[in-house]
């Protein structure tokens, strides 16, 4: 299979080609020495980034201030009102109201809430000073919770489909007593609640139609990505291609994780210019790809306690960045082990797969990808129009760099 079919986001093609051409023969020390060189010259050929030459992997922009603890506290303070809005519509059906409240508490209020907080932070960065009223900040927080509800919806469905064990350090929702397959119906309660809140709080706003279309588009695209993810698992080795992975990542992760929160804030801030939305989307989809590659890496090599869930990609035979690169770089004996062990639930076989990942120096390859991707996206941000504050996008990018959970 030609390399161009096995690369990561085309953003990092030349970097990955350099390392993949080692064919697994170079020891980790040689790889590390290569990483220390400042003489690399790569050409980026991302579908979202104009091709340009990069002289070095150093000299990134100054990292700006990020979301504060006060922002997180204020965001959480709105959550009880969100739950009340959702439960008051059915005052005569106490069982349903109780279930919705429990659903929200268990599946929406936890986690890092990065997507929801991104809506608020983005609005503060994008809106003119006169629009930063307490009422508008509160509305941005409500819309942030709408994004978090979509996240909760996808989490419940994904955990059920993957038969995951834990999420955020607790048993997955479907594993709670009395839930089981009902989790699919419960997830729909969260999804419908998201659109209920949009209607309740935004139907008289100029941006309401754009906002609903944005959420529906994110929902549709993410569903496409989730579905393709489910049907792309090993042992069908023809599914382990980077073209397929790029599609899954773009649709399953990038749209609702990065594009949706920022585009929501843009509409709320009165930014309708199609070119500005195109530029923002271009950067945000690249961040989403970067985010998913990180997730794939952390699923295998991350700290389970810090992440809050047990990695399952190997036993599920997922189409992941690590798996694709491993099959590309593996020697015939290594490939034979991967084909016999990848996608099985036996602990000793899972360990064999992970051992081969290490033999192939995939942690070092990943860190090289991360360093180069961070710098290339930084340069793309620096090319954005003045109507898009660079600090906003640099902050989001910096939150990604080197994350451990």
From Swiss-Prot:
One of its GO terms (cellular component) is cytoplasm. The keyword Metal-binding applies. Its cofactor is Mg(2+). Pfam families: polyprenyl_synt. Mg(2+) 1 binds at residues 158, 162. GO terms for molecular function: (2E,6E)-farnesyl diphosphate synthase activity; dimethylallyltranstransferase activity; metal ion binding. Keywords: Isoprene biosynthesis, Magnesium, Metal-binding, Transferase. Mg(2+) 2 binds at residues 158, 162. A motif (DDXXD motif) lies at residues 158-162. It catalyses: isopentenyl diphosphate + (2E)-geranyl diphosphate = (2E,6E)-farnesyl diphosphate + diphosphate. Its EC number is 2.5.1.10. InterPro entries: FPS1-like, Isoprenoid_synthase_dom_sf, Polyprenyl_synt, Polyprenyl_synt_CS. Belongs to the FPP/GGPP synthase family. Farnesyl pyrophosphate synthase involved in murgantiol biosynthesis, a male-released aggregation pheromone, by catalyzing the formation of (2E,6E)-farnesyl diphosphate. This is Farnesyl pyrophosphate synthase.
């Amino acid at each position: 299979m030609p390399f161009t079919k096995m690369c990561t986001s085309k953003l990092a093609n030349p970097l990955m080609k350099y390392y993949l051409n080692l064919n697994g023969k170079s020891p980790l020390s040689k790889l590390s020495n290569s990483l220390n060189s400042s003489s690399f010259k790569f050409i980026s050929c991302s579908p979202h980034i104009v091709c340009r030459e990069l002289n070095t992997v150093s000299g990134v922009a100054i990292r700006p201030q990020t979301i504060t603890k006060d922002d997180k506290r204020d965001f959480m303070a709105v959550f009880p009102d969100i739950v009340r809005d959702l439960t008051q519509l059915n005052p005569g059906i106490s069982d349903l109201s109780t279930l919705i409240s429990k659903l929200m508490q268990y599946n929406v209020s936890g986690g890092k809430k990065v997507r929801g907080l991104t809506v608020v932070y983005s609005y503060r960065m994008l809106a003119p000073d006169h629009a930063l009223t307490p009422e508008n900040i509160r509305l941005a927080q409500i819309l942030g919770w709408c994004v978090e509800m979509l996240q909760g919806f996808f989490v419940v469905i994904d955990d059920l489909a993957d038969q995951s064990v834990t999420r955020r350090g607790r048993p997955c929702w479907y594993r709670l007593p009395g839930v089981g397959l009902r989790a699919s119906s419960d997830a729909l309660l969260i999804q419908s609640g998201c659109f209920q809140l949009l209607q309740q709080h935004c139907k008289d706003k100029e941006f309401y139609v754009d906002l609903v279309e944005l959420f529906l588009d994110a929902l549709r695209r993410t569903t496409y990505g989730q579905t393709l993810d489910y049907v792309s698992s090993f042992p069908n080795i023809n599914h382990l291609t980077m073209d397929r992975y790029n599609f899954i990542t773009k649709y399953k992760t990038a749209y609702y994780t990065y594009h949706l929160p920022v585009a929501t804030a843009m509409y709320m801030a009165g930014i309708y210019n199609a070119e500005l939305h195109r530029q923002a989307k271009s950067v945000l989809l690249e961040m989403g790809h970067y985010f998913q590659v990180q997730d794939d890496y952390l699923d295998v090599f991350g700290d389970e306690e810090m992440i809050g869930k047990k990695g399952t990609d190997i036993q599920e035979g997922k189409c992941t960045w690590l798996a694709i690169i491993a099959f590309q770089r593996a020697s015939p004996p290594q490939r034979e082990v991967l084909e016999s062990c990848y996608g099985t639930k036996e602990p000793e076989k899972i360990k064999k797969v992970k051992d081969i990942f290490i033999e192939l120096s995939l942690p070092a390859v990943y860190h090289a990808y991360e360093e180069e991707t961070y710098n290339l996206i930084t340069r793309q941000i620096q090319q954005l129009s003045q109507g898009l504050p660079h600090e906003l996008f640099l902050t989001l990018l910096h939150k990604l760099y080197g994350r451990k959970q």
